[in-house]
Amino acid sequence: MSERHLPDDQSSTIDPYLITSVRQTLAEQSAALQNLSKQLDSGQYQRVLNLIMNCKGHVILSGMGKSGHVGRKMSATLASTGTPSFFIHPAEAFHGDLGMITPYDLLILISASGETDEILKLVPSLKNFGNRIIAITNNGNSTLAKNADAVLELHMANETCPNNLAPTTSTTLTMAIGDALAIAMIHQRKFMPNDFARYHPGGSLGRRLLTRVADVMQHDVPAVQLDASFKTVIQRITSGCQGMVMVEDAEGGLAGIITDGDLRRFMEKEDSLTSATAAQMMTREPLTLPEDTMIIEAEEKMQKHRVSTLLVTNKANKVTGLVRIFD
């Protein structure tokens, strides 16, 4: 790749006004959000929330251009928080994809002007199907608004774009409205972390909320007998690489554990170590986790008791493995 494709960001002088422009844009968008919050029509929002809550089908988003991109995000947020939803492109809908829509679906149509041709072309068909329509627009007197069952206005003075052309403030406001509706539904549906995890099984949260310790535990638990010597205990802790060792009774059951910390504390108070046994050093009745414990519960228990490793037991109370907080 030639040097001209790798410009040195220190070689060019940036006009200080550009930084001022960045600050101004952020300030203007923030002010627009504040203005929307103050001017929103609570009656219209109540109607919209009721329509979403009582929808028996899908909440379908549609918009052209940048409004379409925002609509996709809004749909994804609704779907991931318990409200079945998908996005449909208005042009594709007008050429066959209307077949994806059932009479039980609720449509949210996005158009800042309220006069987007591709959006307006959908309205007669939607009304014929019997669908309810929610309009998100900056023009409460637009054709779209007049044909909607509920209208959420942006109350925007102008776009942040210096030419008042590129969708900037309007997309920010629309995105915020989508998030506000989704959050309201989370409250209404009492949508909890466990519910969220069901729709995000591949993410970190989903793993922690849906995975049990039996699924991730290590089965090879370092162990010593009650009469094991101090030297044997150290060797087993070292070779086991877990920072602890399980102490077994005569029947192979759990008698206790010895951690690195237990060893240090024992060494501080005992003068003679050559005759010490595991029974003298161990912590009796250590904390354990049932195999069906969720990972998130295991993490909470470890953090509460300030430990990094816990033994896992089966229904017969036999040790079957161990789990670490960083597994």
From Swiss-Prot:
InterPro entries in the record, alphabetically?
CBS_dom, CBS_dom_sf, GutQ/KpsF_isomerases, KdsD/KpsF-type, SIS_dom, SIS_dom_sf, SIS_Kpsf
Positions of the SIS domain: 48-191
The protein's annotated catalytic reaction(s) are: D-arabinose 5-phosphate = D-ribulose 5-phosphate
Origin: domain of life: Bacteria
Write out the residues that bind substrate. 82-83, 89, 95, 121-130, 155-157
CBS domain residues: 217-273, 282-327
Q: Where does ATP bind?
A: 63-68
EC numbers: 5.3.1.13
- Name a biological process GO annotation: lipopolysaccharide biosynthetic process
Q: Where does Zn(2+) bind?
A: 89
Gene Ontology terms, MF aspect: arabinose-5-phosphate isomerase activity; ATP binding; metal ion binding
Query: If you read the UniProt record, what top EC class would you report for this enzyme, in one word?
Result: isomerase
Pfam family, any one: SIS
Give site residues, Catalytically relevant.
Answer: 66, 118, 159, 200
Q: Which UniProt keywords apply?
A: ATP-binding, CBS domain, Isomerase, Lipopolysaccharide biosynthesis, Metal-binding, Nucleotide-binding, Repeat, Zinc
Its biological function? Answer: Involved in the biosynthesis of K-antigen capsules. Catalyzes the reversible aldol-ketol isomerization between D-ribulose 5-phosphate (Ru5P) and D-arabinose 5-phosphate (A5P).
* Stored NCBIfam families: kpsF
Subunit description: Homotetramer.
Q: Which family does it belong to?
A: Belongs to the SIS family. GutQ/KpsF subfamily.
Q: Per its record, how is this protein called by name? A: Arabinose 5-phosphate isomerase KpsF
Which species is this UniProt entry from? Escherichia coli
- What gene does the UniProt entry assign to this protein? kpsF
